[in-house]
Each structure stands twice: as structure tokens, then as C-alpha cells.
Amino acid sequence: MDEVQMETARIQSPKSYLYTTLATTHLGEIASCIISILISNGRLTAREISNRTKIPTKNIKSALVSLIQLNCIYYWQEEKDRKFYYSLKETGLLLFVYSGDIINHIKRQYGEDEAEIIQNILIHGHVKIEDYLTQFNHDKSMKIDQENKFLKLFNDNWLIKLQDYHFHSLDDIWHKIFEECLKDTPRSSVTSEIKRVAEAQAKAKVKLNTLLESGTTGGGDIFTEVNGMKKLKPDLVVTFNLSRFQKHLRTNAFVNMVRSKIGVLTAIVYDAALRYIENKSPPMDYPLLDIPGLINDPKDVKEYILSIENKLVNEKKITFSARDIQRLLPKDIDFKNSVITPTFAKPKRPLENGSSPTLKKIKLEDGIASSTSTSTSTSSSTSSNGTSIDLNTLEQHLKLLLNGTNTAFVNEISPGNYTIPFSHLTNILKQNNFEALVKATLGDYAFRILRCVKSMKLCDEKSICNGALLKEKTVRSELYHLIKANIIEIQEVPRSADRAASKTFYLFRHKSNSNFNYLKNCLIYDMAEILNRIQDFKLEHKILLEKYKLVEGQEDQYLLDRELKLLNDLQLREIKNLVKFQRIKSLYSLYSLVD
């Protein structure tokens, strides 16, 4: 991609800049041009893409096939003109961003073989199980083992069945379903057109949800039984479920927040609780919210998200108890006395013969008396290595998560049964990280002013001075920096009908959602900038890097000392940039959560 096209992608939007850069790095020049044009112009045919990019139609079509397979492009055939239209699909491009993290996580949680399966699926976009297992035909036991690993990954929702709707844009699918439902809803003299459209819309929502859930629920077209053993059908085509990995990222974010606010051991308990319900937890993307014009009011959006969460709670899919999470806790950590409950009762008088427990005689069935100790026994279960995990202690940790801080990290729906308020915690997570960023970048005074503005919602300079206990000069200076960073907005309030400047005063306010979106766009832009920086210094030293590839393993003999030093500097520079990229990516993942 030439400099003009890259500059156009950079100026257009942060997402355009990042996605074009990713396509250039992983897929080549033609793919990056196609993605850039689709972001700029929306849905286009292959001929229209060819005319705008000046690339032959034949090359465009062959590139589109690969992009569709890698989940980077949607296609749709119109019924009227029978033409194929293509639009951008973000899933494949996001998989390029997270691919390394996905493989590392699967390797840690499952093993090398499972990571290899996921890696092959990420490379090819989707895989037919039968085709993948042909490489193990020489070893029947290994083939059975691989089949079981596919089944485990599918049951844990890392793999899902590839459906037709995965290749089509949600807008096109919704429009088609809605038109069908509208035709099936007859006009009536006693029913208004508004009510008829609302009925058709309600039916279309049910149909769309049924269609989207069909790939994750087990059915006759997914599973089969061989010798009494459940297996996936050999002709089943599976693809990776990005939403499942994003749930894992949400789990990590919640655990880190608990670790910083309460402590390490409570965070371990919370991690076990989240992992227990992670697979069935609320989705990371809500299809109905992505359809323009369907749910517009912010209150309706919030109610819709909460209704899905409450439905999962009522179905007991995201509820747990101390006994449920007990087996998921690490065996090498002793939780005994990890929660100290102070009591103000007077200490009991010590026994005369020391601290030995009282002995009590119990008459057995055979008439022989047996002495037993009356020392207090706890309801604990002992693991294989002797570590005692006390259910009472786990309950205390859960109570600490419920009442230990101003934030309720769990909700108790019935005695001993808990759930996690995902939507509420997501908003708190974003707020906490945003305030931490303001404090780290702009200082303590800016942080105090931000908290003051948030508490008063709409205030002037004098109110901020009184609330934050700062001088007027300091407040004015910090407000300038906060406004420049788009953290605080100015509200002009005229005192006269002619809006004279001399009679106008200004108020300040903070809007969380707009700030989060602005920060998210900044993070996307920074990720693209880092990737471009890496590519730029690789191009600057292209000859040296090609020479290194030719003599790899014998560079000490064929390269000069200054070349070796420069090569080492390039490697360190790339590592530093990749570390920055990972940090920004982790922060971007937080603000991509839907609350």
C-alpha cells in the first residue's frame, strides 16, 4: 500500500488505520486496499472495488475468497439483481490482534495438542474435523485422542459450528427476516400499521435469536454416538469463537480489580468463581444492539442487557456456591485463617492442664466406652496433598466480596448461592481504570477535580474550588488540561436572551460514555502507530534483515561487528514496541466490554 492510501486510512478513523495496517502486515497489499476501500465506502461489489482501487477484477476476486475464509469480509447476494456485495467483518482482524494470546491461553489451560488445533483453525479460518483427522489415520489411538480434544474444546465453547450466517452481515440477515415476518403479518382494519410493524419486529427478534443460538446448542447435526461414546460428527465444520476468549479477558480484568481492592487470596477465590460460570456468562456482543435503529434509547439498551443477565440468573446458569468453586481452587494454597474475624468477647479462662481438649466418653454399640475429643471440627475437605480447604473460609471470602468494599463483586440471590453482576462491574471497572489513568498522566489535582465534577454532575469553577479544596488558579489550570484531553466538557449558560458574552458563565460536566469511546479510539490509533513503527524500521534495514535470514545460525562468521550490534538494537527495539502494544491492547480490551 502506497503512502497516500496509508495516510488516507490513518486520517479517516482509528479503526481504519489499525485494520489497514493489520491487513498489510498479515495479508498483503491487495487485501489492505480492499479493506481500506470497504471501510471508506461500505458495501461494494467486486467490480466497484476494482474500479476504486485500480486493481484487476480477477485479483480482487481471488483476494476476496481468502478474506471471506479468514472472517475478514461478509458477502451477500441481493435477490433483485443477483449481484454479490461485500462488506467488512471485524472478527478476523481482531483474531490477528489476539491470536498469540489465544494460543498461549489454550496451551496453558489444555495443552500443546489443543493449542495446535486452535492454531490451525486460526490460520485457515475454519476446519472440517474429518480433514484435520486424516493426518492421524496411521495411529488409531491418537486419532481417538484428537477427536476427544475437539469434543472438549467444542463443549467448552472455544469452537462453534460454522453456519451460513457467519458469512453474512447481520444487517442483511435482519432485513431479510423482518421483511418475511412483515409479509406474514396481514394488514387489518382494526390494527394500526404501527402495531403491525411492532408485531413483525417482535417475531423477527425471536427468529434472529433462534438462528444465532443454533450453532452453539447441541443437536442431531452436531453430535453422534460411536460404541456408546459421544463424538462430534466427522463432516462438521468448526471455527473459533472469539466471544469465548473475550469472556476470558473479562474474567482476568475482574480478578485484577479484586486483587487490587481486597487481596490476593480473595482474588483466587473470585477467579475460581468466574471460571466456574465463564462459559455460560453473558455474551460479549449483543446482535440486536448492532442493528441500527432497532434499540436506540440508552435506557432501553441497559434494560435489554440486564434482561439477558437476569434470564441467565433465573435459569441458574451463572449461579454458584462455595462447594461448586471448591474443586477449582489451587491445591498448593492453604486458605486456613486467611480471613480474620475479630471478636470482642472476653477470652475464656485457660484449662488447668494447658490447652489440651476435653475428653468425652461415648458408649458404643458393643458396650465398650471410647474417649473422643470435643475440640471443634470444621467442615472442610482435604485435598490429595493434605491441604485443607475450609468451606466456612470460602464463605467468608464470598461475604468479603459481597460486603468487604463499597463495590459488591457478587450478589447473594439466596442463602449460600451467589451470582456476579457483570454489567454493573464492567461499568465500575471502566471508571476505576479511567480515573487511574487520569491520576497517573495528569496528576493528583486533576484526579480530585474529576471526582468533584463527577459527584456534582454540573458545576462552575467556584463550586469546584470549594469541593476539591484547591485554589482558583490551580483549578483553572487543571481544568484547561482536562478539557484539552476531552475528559471534561464545557456547558455555556447565557444569562440574557441575546446571549451576550459578558453575561454568560460556564459550567463543567463529565460524560463517561463519550470519554470511554474517545479513549478507546486513542488506544486503537496507538496500536496502529506501533505496528507501523515496527514495519518502518524493518523496511529501513531491509537489506540487513534479508542478509541475516540467509546466514541465520552462522551470523557471527558472516556479519560484521557493527551489523551484529545493529541487529541486536533492532531486536530490542521491536521487543520494546511489542511490549507497549501488549499493554495498550490489554487496556483496549477493557473498554471494548459492553456494559
Swiss-Prot record:
Pfam families: HTH_9, POLR3C_WHD, RNA_pol_Rpc82. One of its GO terms (cellular component) is RNA polymerase III complex. GO terms for biological process: termination of RNA polymerase III transcription; transcription initiation at RNA polymerase III promoter; tRNA transcription by RNA polymerase III. One of its GO terms (molecular function) is DNA-directed RNA polymerase activity. Residues 523-544 are annotated as: Leucine-zipper. The keyword Zinc applies. DNA-dependent RNA polymerase catalyzes the transcription of DNA into RNA using the four ribonucleoside triphosphates as substrates. Specific core component of RNA polymerase III which synthesizes small RNAs, such as 5S rRNA and tRNAs. Belongs to the RNA polymerase beta chain family. This is DNA-directed RNA polymerase III subunit RPC3. It comes from Candida albicans (strain SC5314 / ATCC MYA-2876) (Yeast). The gene is RPC82.
